[in-house]
Each structure stands twice: as C-alpha cells, then as structure tokens.
Amino acid sequence: AYPFASQNDKDFNNLLDVYLDAVFFSRLHELDFAQEGHRIEFSEEGNVDSPLEYKGVVFNEMKGAMSSAVSQLWQGISSYLFPTTTYHYNSGGDPAAITDLSYEQLLSFYKTHYHPSNAIFMTFGALDISELHNKLETQALSRFERQHKQWRVEPEKRYTAPMAVEQAYGLDSEDLSAATHHVMGWLLGESTDLDAQLEAHLMSQVLLDNSASPLRRALEQSDLGSSPSPLCGLEDSNREMSFMCGIEGSEPEHAAAVEQLILDTLESVVRDGVDQAMIDASLHQLELHQREIGGDHYPYGLQLIFNSLPAATHYGDPAALLNLDPALERLRETAGSGTFMQDTVQRLLLNNRHRVRYTLKPDDGINEE
C-alpha cells in the first residue's frame, strides 16, 4: 500500500501526481537495480586484493532486518503456518535469495503486478470525486490495456495433524543458555469475516491481555523461560488470521514442556471457564479500540482505509468491515452466553489441527557461515 494524506488541496494533488507516476511509470534503470538491489564489490573500496562481497541498499536493509531473533522467529513460524501461499515468503526479501534476483525478473514482475488492473484506489474526505476519477483515468488507467487475470491469495491447505519444527539462528556469544524461543501458532478463519475477526480478537484479549489473563499468567509464572514471547497475540493482516503464543529465554529441550503448558492452560479454560467480568472488560476494551478515532497513530481516513483494505484485496466487501455496530452487537450477545470462551477456545485452538510448534535455538556458528 502507498498511503498519503493532506488537508491542502494543492498538496494532495501534487502528491497524487507523484504517486501515480512513481507507482505506474517507474523507470527502473539497471544501474538503480544494482544500487538498490544487489551487486558485487570489493569489500575494501579501491583495494582489488580485498575479498568480493554482495552489497545493495535493499540487500543490506534486509540483512539488518533479519539479524534479530524476533524477525527470524516471525518469518520462521509464518513459513510453516503458510506452507503453500504467498505468506510463506519474506515480503521484504530473504537476503539469501535477493542475490538470485535478476534485473529482467524485476522488470517482468513490475510490469505484471504494478498494473492498474491490479490496483485498488481508496480515498477519504471532502473530495470532488468526478475530478479525482478523471485524474486517475487520464494519468494512469487509460494508458494501459486491461488485464483479465485476477490475482488471488487462495486459502491455505490445512494440515491434518499438528507439526513441530526446530531451527537455529545466529548468536555471537559463548553463552547460549536462556536464548531459545518456543512459539505455538494456529491458523484461524478469514480476516474478511468481521464476526470471525472480532471473535478471535476477543478470545486473544481474554487469554493474553494482562497478567490476570489465563494464558499470559501461565507463561509469566512458568520457569520454562524468562517471559512471554513478543509474538503473543492475533495477526489479522493476512487473508487468514493466525494466533500465536509462546515463551522466550528458554532452552531447546523445553519445547515439549512449553507446548504442554499452553495446551493444559487452554484445556483448563475450556473445563473451568473464565470469569464473565473478565470477558465483559475485554469486550469493552475491544469495542473502544475498534471505535477509536486516530487510535492507531494514523489520520482517521487512513485508519478506515487500512481496516477495509483486506476485504478489498481479497475480493470481499470493504464496507462490511466498517459496519461495526451489528457485528459488535452479535458478539456482545455471544460473549454473554456463559460459555463463550469454552466454545471458542475449543473450536479455534484445541480442535484445530493446523497448529505449529516452532522452536528457534541459538547457534554461535551460523553468523560466520
């Protein structure tokens, strides 16, 4: 997405001109590809006897981005939660794969995908829509032949049984203790289904919101690691949502014990339930967050656009994701049934076979390789 906003008409139109030109008519010179993508240079400038190495702005940025354990943790478990769809891949580019990209492949990808037939235009504010549409038509749409292929992200093929994976990350330290991450992830329903999205958000909030929440409390009080994983929570930006929880500061051999701790905690929620006051408080917080204007540090218009964009991207109804009142009323009724958490945890998590236990352990030799 390429968002911009301005309260000044002239500034807005100037930005629109620049964005339309940059997105649909990029020059993409080969020298720019070498600078921004990848190239081979001597490691010491001017020293022809120094070793050759890969360089490039994006290449170096992604090396930096993927140097953190949390980034590798997120990419690692995502690749197993989404084994066959586009979410399997690192959207910024895997540094190890960037050097295989050719200039011709980049041009082909750009011409195929950065095309008005694939574009979604969303606007908010007191705009002259006819004037705006005419600008889009004359400066972009009319200058291309329509493509008839629709690009879709298909639903992920579901596992028939849970899986466990262990991988390693580089850590430059002689002491590798208390540096392992264990995370469990589940693939849930469609993010374009507002009822399913709100239900999953409420379940996640009740389980993980604070130290009194059952799953967060179990992870915080466990001696299997130092603290809950930063990945704990619900991810709803992909076509299908995912729920994750886990622990950091652990040891590789604790993987099965962490998994059992999480499953036992979820089973206790199903068996014993959760205080209705906790559910009501979480629902109230969820409702406030959903209705909050500017609560995500964006202008209100961009906030609405980002909320509805997943439905537009996946050929759903963008307006439906903004019609909160009926969905919140349905959730309020369901959440007050007395068995909301039991039913939801059982259905979305315990009965869900598309589950991954992912362990990321330190290795002091990887960085040298």
Features from the language model and the residues they span:
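Aromatic/basic-lined ligand-recognition segments
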Residues: 164-170
